[in-house]
Curated annotation (Swiss-Prot):
Pfam families xrefs: Ribosomal_L16
Superkingdom as given in the UniProt entry: Eukaryota
Subunit description: Part of the 50S ribosomal subunit.
UniProt-listed PROSITE patterns: RIBOSOMAL_L16_1, RIBOSOMAL_L16_2
Coiled coil start-end: none
Species this chain originates from: Aethionema cordifolium
Gene of this entry: rpl16
Protein name, per record: Large ribosomal subunit protein uL16c
Family: Belongs to the universal ribosomal protein uL16 family.
GO BP annotations listed: mitochondrial translation
Length: 135
């Protein structure tokens, strides 16, 4: 699972998901990509599940790039705990994505194989996405 090696602070505010992605919204490495259409938090488990699904489908030949990294800690309070006494402890990591962000890129494979692999990865994501091809 992906997570930062070290961070400056253990806990973060939740923040809000408004606007669109101005960075990381163009294909840089591969020929095909999976692009988000709505804002969300994507967990490191979901990122890894998508990556594994794509790798298993492409087998040899193709190259995959993961363009997002989970750098936001999500805290969770223990079950049946009374209110107060501070914030919970960090439980898992998420990547904050906005509409337009590229999640995965792929190259070195025919379009039909890339489309199939990326659609399987898209089914692992908690949001609507689209398949795009670089010009």
């Amino acid at each position: 699972m992906l997570s930062p090696k070290r961070t400056r602070f253990r806990k973060q505010h939740r923040g809000r998901l408004k606007g669109i992605s101005y960075r990381g919204n163009r294909i840089c490495f591969g020929r095909y990509a999976l692009q988000t259409l709505e804002p969300a938090w994507i967990t490191s488990r979901q990122i890894e599940a998508g990556r594994r699904a794509m790798t298993r489908n492409v087998r040899r030949g193709g190259k995959i790039w993961v363009r997002i990294f989970p750098d936001k800690p999500v805290t969770v309070r223990p079950a049946e705990t009374r209110m107060g006494s501070g914030k919970g402890s960090p439980e898992y990591w998420v990547a904050v994505v906005k509409p337009g962000k590229i999640l995965y890129e792929m190259g070195g494979v025919p379009e039909n194989i890339a489309r199939k692999a990326i659609s399987i990865a898209a089914s692992k994501m908690p949001i609507k996405t689209q398949f795009i091809i670089s010009e």
